[in-house]
Amino acid sequence: MEKIQPAVISCGFCEHASKRSDVNMAELVYEAVDDCITKADSIEWKDIDCVINGNMPAFEGANMPELWMTDHIAAKNKPLLRVTTGGTTGGSVFISAYYAVASGLYDMVLAIAFEQQSCGDTTVGLSSVALGEVSIFPELGYDIERLRRNMGAGAAIGVASYQAMNYMKRSNATEEDLARVVVQNRRNAAKNWWTHLKMPNLTIDDVLDTPYISYPLRFGMVCPASDGACAVLFTTEKKAKEIADIPVYVNGVASVSNEPAIIGVDVSGAGQVDPTEQLGAVKCAEIAYGQAGIAFPNKEIDYAEVYSPFPNQELMWVERTGLFEPNSEPEAYKNGITAKEGELPINCSGGVNSTNAIGASAMERPAESVLQIMGKAGNQVPKTVHTALGHGWGGAINLITHIVLADEPRRKFK
């Protein structure tokens, strides 16, 4: 059987904001799709064989929106698949599109990920998922009373604050170190046309002057709720070389989940008690790097986009994905190693900390890495990027996606 190497030939975005009241959901997504296909030059809507899309319908309160926006997403009379995996939705959509091409089933696949959070209430959507799981806890023998003390009670920031405290304990990081990550992200976002929070003059003191939401995380440290969409166009290696000036090859993909840490902390589960361990992220990186033939990621990866709604997570993820030694990141950020001009630039798009359309966020990470390799990013790094990483996170700090991209096909088929 022929081994097919998928490649990305174009990525598109729409403008992100807290409320895109100028468009409805279909029009919002269309902007990203049109941007993607227009940038692909010779490609037309009719050339697309299949569309794979994803969002979190409960967050908008609109069930199966892809069925009434087919005319806006090049999906009319074509196979259409929806993928939903929480915060990792975009990464899962990306990987699904990769396999749709790698399997030989389709030659050209359009991947779309989006969220229009202003249409609904994300917290209510999250609660509906959580309550469904909590309702069966007594039947499984869990002590439901102890859940009140659990980090899950604070939703996303409740989880992240526990992570932050554990990471600070491990690494001796300070609140100033967390604020430094935020400043770098928001200043990067100011140089990228589609991002949400653009703050070119933000300082560490500005961040530290904001009130606590959940210690040690302050209001100025948390991600926004964004409306936005992203689209990525996949095809085969052969077609990519014919169409694109600089095709970007998907050399490694992985998705790994382990038991939610919120169970292990205080509900009598067997999960991890330290939410910064992230063994799922370590394993996910190991699988994807193995597929891509990468033995020393800290030396072979030129650029990375990691999923970090909160600054402590950015410090944590780049360590767990093998780009830096454990507990070394606060010093690396202080020394400018992860800056745009640094040795290993991280999140030059501004990251999830600056723009968070939840369904799209995990696909925007590899999409931005693709653009860095192509030399077409909004906040392009000065060095040449040959190999890059796109990382996603979702679930109860337990579901990870890991995507390795490069300017040469190096997929290790087994």
Residue ranges: model-predicted function:
Residues 1-82, 102-103, 113-223, 230-231, ...:
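Conserved "HGTGT" condensation-loop signature of ketosynthase/thiolase-family condensing enzymes
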Residues 88-92:
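Glycine-rich anion/phosphate-binding loops
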Residues 106-107:
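Alpha-to-beta junction loops
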Residues 358:
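Active-site rim segments in enzyme catalytic domains, especially the processed small/beta chain
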